[in-house]
Amino acid sequence: MKVLIFGATGAAGGSVLRTCLAAAGVNEVRAITRRPLKLTHPKLRVFIHGNYLRYNGVESAFTGVEACLFCLGVSSTQVSEEAEYRQITHDFAVAAAQVLKAQSPNAVFHFISGKGTQIDGRFMWARVKGETERDLMTLVGATCWRPAFIDGESSDSWPWLFRVLQPLLRLLKPFPNLYVRGQDLGHAMLQATAENMRGRVIENAEIRGIANRYGK
């Protein structure tokens, strides 16, 4: 299996990247990123690219893959305007899905959304993510993942409070609706690809259940 990852420098994406590199069933991992990765691996191909609305010159990264794992995102607390949050959350994902549809029409597009996403929700971030899920499912039959707390790779992009609270948040591990390891999120995405799972919204407890099927 060949997979393409976005957001490999982030907490969720970094965990998914390492999971894919360690997976016996994955023979090539491609990552589109704005800056070089610290990690090197024989399976890994990195495409440095700065414009996430246009993919001229890196279309080959999308060609011949079985899955695109879109882990790119930002906390709404880290941007000052809804327009900026919408561009990062919605527009970047839709642009990538359009290129994937053209280059690898049979590939599965995975989008990391989040627990509490609701298209008519009270909060701006929930509405934007809900609209993104809707548009991606219409465009490419995307599989949309709604994890709660992702216990993933430490990232400089995390809000400082989240970094401080991470050890305490691990106390949520016994609660299937509230906690998932980054590794398990990666395993669930690979398992869903193998099962050709499309056009679904998957909540945290089901993520853990799908991950438990991986490799069995």
Give short role names for the model-derived ranges.
Residues 31-38:
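Short, polar loop motifs at secondary-structure junctions
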Residues 2-25:
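N-terminal Rossmann NAD(P)H-binding glycine-rich loop of SDR-like oxidoreductase domains
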Residues 22, 27, 42, 118-215:
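Oxidoreductase cofactor-interface core, primarily capturing Rossmann-like NAD(P)-dependent enzymes
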Residues 3-4, 38, 45-95, 99-102:
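NAD(P)H-binding glycine-rich loop region in Rossmannoid oxidoreductase-like domains
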Residues 23, 35, 74, 79-127, ...:
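Conserved Rossmann-fold NAD(P)-dependent oxidoreductase catalytic core, especially the SDR/UDP-sugar
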